[in-house]
């Protein structure tokens, strides 16, 4: 996964939650790349070389609109196979077609962020197949008069608007 750009409006989940999803899907190698200014300058070939330094992929799954590399040397999902072969690696590339809502809107992280911002968590679940989760494991908290109290300033995920939500609280992994 790629952590969002610093100027973004928050992550959909934490790296810990994302790693848990990947494990449930049977993914045995998971690389988190911090989308920094230095990273944004990497060429498409440099990106492939970096992936091969960090892991030995047998297969990679990307969306059909996946792009990588700096704008002056960018590549798309269709270029992945050839770029891996240039590095001497035969990596299976699975390109997933875009999935649209019933209204024809592309299901994307942008759409999912909008649903969270609008508090539309049931629709978020319908589209993503996952309940919206807030990772409180690294957040200091206390119980005060039977209520869980923590600072939302310490949460780096995108949060829904203030309000009352039907939730499950899980205090361990």
Give the residues covered by each predicted segment.
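Core alpha/beta nucleotide-donor-binding catalytic domains of modification enzymes
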Residues: 1-53
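Active-site cores that bind ATP or allylic diphosphates and position pyrophosphate for catalysis
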Residues: 37-38, 45-173
